[in-house]
Amino acid sequence: MKVTVVYYPGDPAAKGAAEALEREYGIKALELPEDPPFFDFNSLAGDAFIVLSRHSSEKRVKAFTVHHTGNFGEAKLGGEPKRLGVAYPSLACSLLRAMNAFRREGYDVTYEATHHGPTSDKPLVFAEIGSVKEDWEDPANHEVLAKAVASWEEHRCEAPKAVWVGGPHYSKRATKRCLEGEACFGHIAPKYALDHLDEDLLRQMVERSFERPERAYVEKKSLKSELRLRVVKALEDLGLEVLVV
Protein backbone atom coordinates (compact mmCIF):
# COMPACT_ATOMS: atom_id res chain seq x y z
CA MET A 1 0.00 0.00 0.00
CA LYS A 2 1.69 3.19 -1.20
CA VAL A 3 0.81 6.25 0.87
CA THR A 4 1.13 9.56 -1.02
CA VAL A 5 1.35 12.93 0.73
CA VAL A 6 -0.66 15.72 -0.92
CA TYR A 7 -1.25 19.43 -0.33
CA TYR A 8 -2.99 22.46 -1.79
CA PRO A 9 -0.61 25.45 -2.26
CA GLY A 10 -3.36 27.94 -1.39
CA ASP A 11 -3.31 26.58 2.17
CA PRO A 12 -0.40 28.14 4.13
CA ALA A 13 -0.22 25.32 6.68
CA ALA A 14 -0.16 22.67 3.97
CA LYS A 15 2.30 24.54 1.77
CA GLY A 16 4.70 25.19 4.65
CA ALA A 17 4.57 21.58 5.84
CA ALA A 18 5.08 20.28 2.29
CA GLU A 19 8.14 22.49 1.86
CA ALA A 20 9.56 21.32 5.20
CA LEU A 21 8.87 17.70 4.27
CA GLU A 22 10.89 17.99 1.07
CA ARG A 23 13.64 20.15 2.57
CA GLU A 24 14.23 18.10 5.71
CA TYR A 25 13.26 14.57 4.64
CA GLY A 26 13.45 14.48 0.86
CA ILE A 27 9.76 13.59 0.57
CA LYS A 28 8.03 15.49 -2.22
CA ALA A 29 4.32 16.01 -1.66
CA LEU A 30 1.97 16.01 -4.62
CA GLU A 31 0.41 19.40 -5.35
CA LEU A 32 -3.38 19.46 -5.77
CA PRO A 33 -5.12 21.92 -8.11
CA GLU A 34 -7.93 22.70 -5.67
CA ASP A 35 -8.82 22.60 -1.98
CA PRO A 36 -8.79 18.91 -0.88
CA PRO A 37 -12.41 18.66 0.39
CA PHE A 38 -13.58 19.29 -3.19
CA PHE A 39 -10.94 17.29 -5.05
CA ASP A 40 -11.64 13.95 -6.75
CA PHE A 41 -9.00 11.68 -5.21
CA ASN A 42 -10.29 8.77 -7.28
CA SER A 43 -8.53 10.43 -10.24
CA LEU A 44 -5.08 10.06 -8.63
CA ALA A 45 -2.79 7.07 -9.07
CA GLY A 46 -1.89 6.62 -5.39
CA ASP A 47 -3.28 3.88 -3.15
CA ALA A 48 -3.85 6.02 -0.03
CA PHE A 49 -3.23 9.64 0.94
CA ILE A 50 -2.09 11.86 3.78
CA VAL A 51 -3.63 15.29 3.23
CA LEU A 52 -1.66 18.17 4.75
CA SER A 53 -4.09 20.88 5.83
CA ARG A 54 -4.94 23.82 8.04
CA HIS A 55 -7.51 23.41 10.78
CA SER A 56 -9.87 26.23 11.74
CA SER A 57 -11.38 26.75 15.19
CA GLU A 58 -13.43 29.67 16.46
CA LYS A 59 -12.04 28.99 19.93
CA ARG A 60 -8.49 29.46 18.54
CA VAL A 61 -7.32 26.20 20.10
CA LYS A 62 -3.72 25.44 19.18
CA ALA A 63 -3.67 21.84 18.00
CA PHE A 64 -2.39 19.21 15.63
CA THR A 65 -5.36 17.14 14.50
CA VAL A 66 -6.14 14.00 12.51
CA HIS A 67 -9.45 13.00 10.98
CA HIS A 68 -11.22 10.98 8.31
CA THR A 69 -13.70 12.41 5.85
CA GLY A 70 -17.38 12.09 5.09
CA ASN A 71 -20.77 13.64 5.75
CA PHE A 72 -23.26 12.19 8.21
CA GLY A 73 -25.76 14.79 7.04
CA GLU A 74 -25.56 17.56 4.45
CA ALA A 75 -22.50 18.04 2.26
CA LYS A 76 -21.61 21.57 3.38
CA LEU A 77 -17.92 21.33 2.49
CA GLY A 78 -17.39 18.88 -0.33
CA GLY A 79 -18.26 15.24 -0.76
CA GLU A 80 -21.73 13.71 -0.95
CA PRO A 81 -24.50 13.92 1.66
CA LYS A 82 -24.87 10.94 3.99
CA ARG A 83 -21.79 9.28 2.57
CA LEU A 84 -18.44 8.55 4.22
CA GLY A 85 -14.99 8.40 2.68
CA VAL A 86 -12.71 5.42 3.18
CA ALA A 87 -10.93 5.45 6.55
CA TYR A 88 -7.43 4.14 7.28
CA PRO A 89 -7.43 3.51 11.06
CA SER A 90 -3.81 2.44 11.57
CA LEU A 91 -2.48 5.33 9.48
CA ALA A 92 -4.57 7.90 11.38
CA CYS A 93 -3.52 6.60 14.79
CA SER A 94 0.12 6.32 13.72
CA LEU A 95 0.08 9.96 12.59
CA LEU A 96 -1.54 11.00 15.86
CA ARG A 97 1.13 9.18 17.86
CA ALA A 98 3.88 10.79 15.79
CA MET A 99 2.32 14.23 16.29
CA ASN A 100 2.19 13.58 20.02
CA ALA A 101 5.87 12.62 20.06
CA PHE A 102 6.93 15.88 18.40
CA ARG A 103 4.26 18.38 19.42
CA ARG A 104 5.19 21.80 20.73
CA GLU A 105 4.44 22.99 24.23
CA GLY A 106 1.02 24.59 24.37
CA TYR A 107 -0.38 22.56 21.49
CA ASP A 108 -2.95 19.81 21.79
CA VAL A 109 -3.01 16.60 19.74
CA THR A 110 -6.40 15.08 18.98
CA TYR A 111 -8.67 13.08 16.73
CA GLU A 112 -11.48 15.05 15.18
CA ALA A 113 -14.78 13.46 14.24
CA THR A 114 -15.36 12.44 10.64
CA HIS A 115 -16.38 15.53 8.69
CA HIS A 116 -16.41 17.30 5.29
CA GLY A 117 -15.40 16.00 1.88
CA PRO A 118 -14.15 14.34 -0.11
CA THR A 119 -16.07 11.08 -0.03
CA SER A 120 -13.33 9.28 -1.92
CA ASP A 121 -13.18 5.57 -2.63
CA LYS A 122 -9.48 5.65 -1.76
CA PRO A 123 -8.38 5.79 1.90
CA LEU A 124 -7.15 9.14 3.11
CA VAL A 125 -6.38 10.92 6.36
CA PHE A 126 -6.23 14.68 6.98
CA ALA A 127 -3.25 15.80 9.10
CA GLU A 128 -3.74 19.37 10.24
CA ILE A 129 -2.29 22.42 11.97
CA GLY A 130 -4.74 24.56 13.93
CA SER A 131 -6.27 26.82 14.33
CA VAL A 132 -5.64 30.43 13.17
CA LYS A 133 -3.46 32.19 10.59
CA GLU A 134 -0.48 32.66 12.90
CA ASP A 135 -0.44 28.90 13.61
CA TRP A 136 -0.79 27.99 9.94
CA GLU A 137 2.13 30.21 8.97
CA ASP A 138 4.46 29.26 11.85
CA PRO A 139 7.56 27.44 10.49
CA ALA A 140 7.93 25.54 13.77
CA ASN A 141 4.49 24.00 13.21
CA HIS A 142 5.42 23.09 9.65
CA GLU A 143 8.44 21.24 11.04
CA VAL A 144 6.32 19.30 13.54
CA LEU A 145 3.80 18.20 10.93
CA ALA A 146 6.54 17.30 8.44
CA LYS A 147 8.41 15.25 11.04
CA ALA A 148 5.22 13.43 12.05
CA VAL A 149 4.36 12.59 8.45
CA ALA A 150 7.91 11.48 7.66
CA SER A 151 8.04 9.15 10.66
CA TRP A 152 4.51 7.77 10.97
CA GLU A 153 5.66 4.22 10.23
CA GLU A 154 8.00 4.37 13.24
CA HIS A 155 4.92 5.06 15.40
CA ARG A 156 2.72 2.46 13.74
CA CYS A 157 -0.42 1.41 15.59
CA GLU A 158 -0.89 -2.36 15.59
CA ALA A 159 -3.85 -2.28 18.00
CA PRO A 160 -7.37 -3.48 17.10
CA LYS A 161 -9.19 -1.29 14.58
CA ALA A 162 -12.31 0.45 15.86
CA VAL A 163 -15.03 3.03 15.32
CA TRP A 164 -16.41 5.52 17.86
CA VAL A 165 -19.97 6.76 18.35
CA GLY A 166 -20.82 9.80 20.48
CA GLY A 167 -18.95 12.52 22.29
CA PRO A 168 -17.70 15.92 21.11
CA HIS A 169 -16.09 16.83 17.80
CA TYR A 170 -12.65 16.62 19.41
CA SER A 171 -12.62 13.06 20.68
CA LYS A 172 -10.28 13.11 23.65
CA ARG A 173 -11.38 9.66 24.77
CA ALA A 174 -10.60 8.08 21.41
CA THR A 175 -7.30 10.00 21.32
CA LYS A 176 -6.30 8.62 24.72
CA ARG A 177 -6.99 5.05 23.61
CA CYS A 178 -4.96 5.50 20.44
CA LEU A 179 -1.98 7.00 22.26
CA GLU A 180 -2.08 4.23 24.87
CA GLY A 181 -2.17 1.52 22.19
CA GLU A 182 -5.67 0.24 22.96
CA ALA A 183 -7.24 0.86 19.54
CA CYS A 184 -6.74 2.54 16.16
CA PHE A 185 -9.82 4.52 15.15
CA GLY A 186 -11.43 4.91 11.77
CA HIS A 187 -14.70 6.80 11.52
CA ILE A 188 -15.88 8.80 14.54
CA ALA A 189 -19.55 9.84 14.71
CA PRO A 190 -19.93 12.76 17.16
CA LYS A 191 -22.94 13.55 19.29
CA TYR A 192 -24.06 16.37 17.00
CA ALA A 193 -24.40 13.88 14.09
CA LEU A 194 -26.48 11.30 15.94
CA ASP A 195 -29.79 12.53 14.48
CA HIS A 196 -28.49 11.41 11.07
CA LEU A 197 -27.05 8.10 12.22
CA ASP A 198 -29.11 5.36 10.58
CA GLU A 199 -28.24 1.74 9.82
CA ASP A 200 -26.75 2.65 6.44
CA LEU A 201 -24.31 5.14 7.99
CA LEU A 202 -23.37 2.67 10.72
CA ARG A 203 -22.67 0.12 8.00
CA GLN A 204 -20.56 2.69 6.14
CA MET A 205 -18.56 3.40 9.30
CA VAL A 206 -17.58 -0.26 9.33
CA GLU A 207 -17.35 -1.10 5.64
CA ARG A 208 -15.91 2.18 4.32
CA SER A 209 -12.55 1.45 5.91
CA PHE A 210 -9.33 0.09 4.42
CA GLU A 211 -8.94 -2.01 7.57
CA ARG A 212 -12.24 -3.44 8.74
CA PRO A 213 -12.97 -2.46 12.35
CA GLU A 214 -13.43 -5.27 14.83
CA ARG A 215 -14.56 -3.14 17.75
CA ALA A 216 -16.92 -0.22 18.41
CA TYR A 217 -16.96 2.21 21.31
CA VAL A 218 -20.32 3.81 22.13
CA GLU A 219 -20.42 6.73 24.58
CA LYS A 220 -23.21 6.04 27.05
CA LYS A 221 -23.84 9.67 28.02
CA SER A 222 -24.23 10.81 24.40
CA LEU A 223 -27.01 8.43 23.40
CA LYS A 224 -30.46 8.06 24.93
CA SER A 225 -31.30 4.51 25.89
CA GLU A 226 -33.47 3.68 22.85
CA LEU A 227 -30.91 5.00 20.37
CA ARG A 228 -28.04 3.38 22.21
CA LEU A 229 -29.71 -0.04 22.08
CA ARG A 230 -30.41 0.37 18.37
CA VAL A 231 -26.84 1.43 17.61
CA VAL A 232 -25.34 -1.38 19.68
CA LYS A 233 -27.52 -3.98 17.96
CA ALA A 234 -26.70 -2.67 14.48
CA LEU A 235 -22.96 -2.73 15.21
CA GLU A 236 -23.15 -6.21 16.74
CA ASP A 237 -25.07 -7.40 13.68
CA LEU A 238 -22.13 -6.13 11.61
CA GLY A 239 -19.86 -8.43 13.60
CA LEU A 240 -18.24 -5.89 15.93
CA GLU A 241 -17.45 -6.23 19.60
CA VAL A 242 -19.29 -3.28 21.17
CA LEU A 243 -18.02 -1.51 24.28
CA VAL A 244 -20.35 0.99 25.97
CA VAL A 245 -18.09 3.49 27.72
Swiss-Prot record:
EC number, UniProt record: 3.1.1.96
Cofactor needs: Zn(2+)
Cystine residue pairs: none
Record keywords: Hydrolase, Metal-binding, Zinc
Origin superkingdom: Archaea
Catalytic reactions on record: a D-aminoacyl-tRNA + H2O = a tRNA + a D-alpha-amino acid + H(+); glycyl-tRNA(Ala) + H2O = tRNA(Ala) + glycine + H(+)
One Pfam family matching this protein: tRNA_deacylase
EC supergroup of this enzyme: hydrolase
Free-text cofactor note: Binds 2 Zn(2+) ions per subunit.
Family statement drawn from the similarity comment of this UniProt entry: Belongs to the DtdA deacylase family.
Task of the protein: D-aminoacyl-tRNA deacylase with broad substrate specificity. By recycling D-aminoacyl-tRNA to D-amino acids and free tRNA molecules, this enzyme counteracts the toxicity associated with the formation of D-aminoacyl-tRNA entities in vivo.
Subunit and interaction comment: Monomer.
Official protein name in the record: D-aminoacyl-tRNA deacylase
Source species: Ignicoccus hospitalis (strain KIN4/I / DSM 18386 / JCM 14125)
